[in-house]
Regions:
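Active-site-facing alpha/beta catalytic cores
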Residues: 1-138, 178-182, 189, 203-210, ...
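Extended C-terminal subregions enriched in glycine
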Residues: 135-214
Length: 220
């Protein structure tokens, strides 16, 4: 994260971090052993990525000897991409065999009835928190597709978390041929999604963004 260091925010963060170290030094000076205090030595940090390369995921899959549950240890949560989201795909089969939370990307090509079958395969017990539906329609299509998807999920009583991915449906090419996204399009799709979900008695549970501090046109 070297690009952060030269920014005003980076300097502000460094100042705060140094102050925290000073406070910890003071605590140790008065006799408190900070190494024995768990919350001073660790942080909850969660990761997620697409379960795309199955040989990689399989090599990092483990079964817990105590609970007997099987986990993909490459990430806390993995998701199935829009192009690998079909009932008989190897990716759906893999995700049905692990106990991690699973995301499912939902684009305009989605068949809602097939999605119900996929959810049943991955989450047969309809466990809350297991499935996140990450919809990626674009600002001009979210009103067309999202209401019907919500209706299908509600009709079948599926417990899901709704997550907006305003990145992939709003990709455009600049005059120079570079792929990019207009930030206003991201805001528009997300705002529209919040309204649609609210009208259907649901709420937005998260947003999927691709971010970087570097000069990358595809991210924001």
């Amino acid at each position: 994260m070297g690009f952060v260091k030269a920014t005003p925010e980076g300097k502000k963060y460094e100042k705060i971090a140094n102050q925290i170290n000073e406070y910890l030094d003071f605590i140790e000076a008065i006799g408190v052993n900070t190494s024995s205090v768990d919350y001073l030595n660790s942080v909850d940090f969660y990761t997620s990525h697409e379960a795309l390369h199955l040989p990689f995921e399989s090599a990092l899959t483990r079964t817990d000897s105590i609970s007997g549950k099987t986990f993909a240890t490459s990430s806390h949560m993995v998701w199935i991409g829009d192009r690998t989201r079909f009932l008989d795909s190897a990716h759906v089969e893999y995700c049905s065999g692990i106990d991690n939370p699973i995301g499912i990307k939902c684009g305009p090509s989605l068949d809602p009835e097939e999605l119900i079958k996929i959810i049943d395969k991955i989450n047969p017990d309809n466990e809350p928190g297991k499935i996140s539906l990450i919809f990626r329609y674009g600002k001009n299509k979210v009103r067309k597709y999202l209401p019907g998807l919500i209706d299908e999920i509600t009709k079948n009583g599926k417990k899901v978390l709704w997550v907006s991915d305003p990145m992939h449906g709003n990709t455009i090419k600049s005059s120079s041929g570079l792929k990019t996204r207009d930030f206003s399009s991201l805001l528009n799709e997300t705002s529209e999604a919040i309204k649609i979900l609210k009208d259907k008695g649901c709420h937005l549970g998260g947003i999927h963004l691709e971010m970087t501090g570097q000069n990358v046109t595809e991210c924001t």
